Amino acid sequence: MKREEINIRDPFVLTRNGQYYLYGTRGATCWGPADGFDVYVSRDLENWDGPFECFYNDGTFWADRNYWAPEVHEYHGKLYMLASFKREDLCRGTAILTADDPLGPFVPHSDGRVTPSNWECLDGTLYVSPDDKPYLVFAHEWVQVGDGEICAMPLSSDLSRAIGEPKLLFHASEAEWARLVHHRSSGRDGYVTDGPSMWRTAGGTLLCLWASFSDEAVSYTHLRAHETRRHL
């Protein structure tokens, strides 16, 4: 299939062995009950094979809705999927799954969420420091805190659990371009933080790319960079 025929949100591409593996939120089940993730495979980023189901909830997984933003990272020779999940009686959070192949099957690796159990969190990504220490960088949702946050939290060497408390990197309102938005369900206003991704420049500066709303767009705007410092 062609790239424009793929119906996903939150795309993430893993490159491995000369191929591109595209993961994302299923468009058809984005806002309601969900049971898995798919992967598409390409050699040119235009023509794709798939979808191939790479994770499926057989009824034993803890979450049943809002399967969002899967990212797959290779770390110490293994593949790890970081994704956001939700259940009605539980806060949204990032859980970690693992597989031996980019096509899966991915299976639960962390014991539920690795983000704080009483925080509404999403869009967790993996950052590995120059001294090989893994961190989860994630968004603390604006629907809970008002002024959305990007936080970082150290992970165990096997990526199965958090080994420290979250550290605030910045608030959404610190960006001059961020626009206040209204949440219809709660009736509150706030600043959104979504989709963090860490990037180090050639000069060694560590940047966080992230998304929110701005006056430049009627709705969602493109990623912007926020300088965090040389290390977390």
Task: Map each language-model feature to its residues.
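A short loop-to-beta-strand structural motif that recurs across blades of beta-propeller domains
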Residues: G36-D38, A95, C151
